[in-house]
Structure formats: structure tokens, C-alpha cells
Amino acid sequence: MPPEPDEAGDAAQPGVHRATPRLLIATSVPSTLTAFLLPYAEHYRQAGWRVEAISNGVSRVARCVAAFDAVHEIGWTRKPTDPGNLTSAPARLRQVVREGGYDIVHAHDPIAAFVTRYALRGLRAAGTVKVVYTAHGFHFYRGAPPVQATVFRALERVASDWTDRLIVINQEDLAAAQAFPLARRGGVVYMPGIGVDTAKYGRDALDPAGAARVRGELGLAADQPLLTMIAEFNPGKRHKDAVAALAASGLEDAVLALAGDGPLVGEVTALAADLGIGERVRALGYRNDIPDILAASTAVLLPSEREGLPRSLMEASSLEVPVITTRIRGVTELVTPETGILHDVGDVPALAAAMRRVVEDPEAAREMGRKGRLKMAEFDLRNVTALHDELYAGLLTDRP
């Protein structure tokens, strides 16, 4: 790793305590902020904190500019081999942290978290700042490619020495983190995800006109089935399984709506055309009306091979929409046979059968949705923000 040319200078400048706590949230890309973290910015700003964000491209996202007290650009990327992640990005981050005088820096994805902890290790050792990482799903999960798992496990073990608190959001990751020395120092904390706002994602909170608008936009008849998947178009989400399952399901009038962006949009829509269902597979792009899309849906799909604790399933269940998903880490903590339908990764026939089941037995589907809503109480955003309050308070008390 390249040296930190100004680390000695950083370490010589302890943090200055202020009456107003200062929090910097670090992510590789702004979509992580908009998808998961804006409620935290609102919560802590209302509590009297100064909350800022650093991400690549964040100043061009109006929702982020409005949500935070300030936003900062940084040139890191989500590509692990990008040399800038360990050359220019650390110096930029140290500059922002020195100027901002933050009490806590909280990172939220693997690359940003590794670079953050590497860059701030001198400041942290000097007691200038506390560093927190929420792992939204380790890359060394059960069933991961062996080389990938070995590399990411080793990197996380190293970086955990530069971490004050590591938050994990599922039981498999909690077990894995117990092997790190950080766990023996009490630095590993379990939280049930990043929370779902069950008040916002509740049938009573939504105007039915929103769901009607979505169905009208898609040209659906009143009783026409709508199967929805909300996920970035990347290989691990396995959109092609959803398309292939729809083609095999025999549900000739069902529509599959795919909300999200990503590099595989063209491949997925081409597959739909090749299978003769191109007109029934709709790539919706990035959307700001996810609650209405979910409320308009017959069921929500997520055939992923890797997840942490998927927000889309939490939101769907909170809205009493049945879910069809894979039997993998994190997901099985959210979904049981009573609240949804689970299948093995890559099992397209099972996914097709699940589609038929929710369409052909609507009462059973509604009962899954009702039970899913009850299950989400333990993942409510208010519970998770209270856990963050407790964690942050402990870190502030522990400041020199």
C-alpha cells in the first residue's frame, strides 16, 4: 500500500470537541445514500447533528444536496482494482476529514469502507475521529467463489484493525466477524439491517391513486398480474432467471417489471425478446416511486445469489406484498415459508412455479403478505435508528 505522506501531521492534530456532533457518511456512489441513508441524515440533523456525505458524483444528485448539511466529491470507484482508490482518494478523504472536524465517519460499502479505514488509520489512532463500517453483506459469504472469498476475508481482517465499530446485518456475517480481533474488543455489533419505515411503507399511508397510476403507465388491466423486481442490473441479482421463469410459467398475461439501472439492461431485455415475451418484460430504469410500484404488484421477486438484508423485500413485506426469493444469507432472516416463497439459487422451474402459485391462489398470496407485514416490525427503521443512537453515543463518550 502507498504511504500516507501526512500521517504524522494528522496524528499530531487531535480533534476539537464541539457542542454539535459531526457525522460524515461515506459511500462509493450516491445511489447508496438515496436508497438507504437519507432517513439517517434527516434523523441526526433533527437531533442537532451536522451531517455531511462524501461520494463520487454526490454533488450532482439534488436529493443528496438537499438532505445533507454539505456534500463532498471524491474520486474513488466501486472497482477494486482502480489505482485511484489507494492513491488519490485517501489524501482527498483525509483533507475533508481534517477540514470538517468530524466526530464519526461512517462508511457503507466495501470499497469505500476499506479506503476510508485505510486513509483514516492515523487520525483514528490519534483519537481524532471514530470510524464505523456497516457491512451490507460480506463478499466472503457461504458459496462465494473461493478466490474472492479468500481475498475479501483477508482485506476485512486487516481493515478491522482500523475500525472502531463494525456493524453486521445478518447472522451469517455476524458469525464470520467473530473471527476478527475486533470482535474480542467488543467492536462487532449486530443490527437488523438498515431499517424499513413501516409507517411510510404501509397500505394506509399510500394514496391508492399511486398504484393505479403505475398500472395505467404499464397498460395493465385491473386484474392483470404484475410481478416486480427492484434491483441493480448486475449478474448477482440474476434478472435472467426472472425472465426465463416468466417464459416458463405459462402465465400468458403476466407482466414482469424490472426497476433499476445497470450494465445488463440490454442483455436482459434481449433475452426476453428471444424468449418471445419482450412485450411483457418492462425495464423501468431508476424510479423514485418505489412504494407505488410495490403497491401495484401481485408479488415481488428477488432471485439473487448474494444479499445482505435486502431492502426491497423489507419494503414489499411491509406493504403486504408477497415475495418470491432465494434461500440465501440474510434473505432467510426476512422471509419464511409463511411470509413468502423461497427457492434455490438458479432454480428457474421453482421460480416459475412460485409465480404461478401467487397468481393462481390470490388468497394464499394475501395471507403471506399479511404475515410479512407482521414480520417487519422487528426491522422497523425506528428500532434501527435507536440502535445507531446508542452506538454513536458510546463512541462520543469514548472520545479523548
Regions found by a protein language model. Name each.
Residues 107-113:
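Short His-centered aromatic/hydrophobic patch
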Residues 322-325:
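Short hydrophobic beta-strand element within catalytic cores of glycosyltransferases
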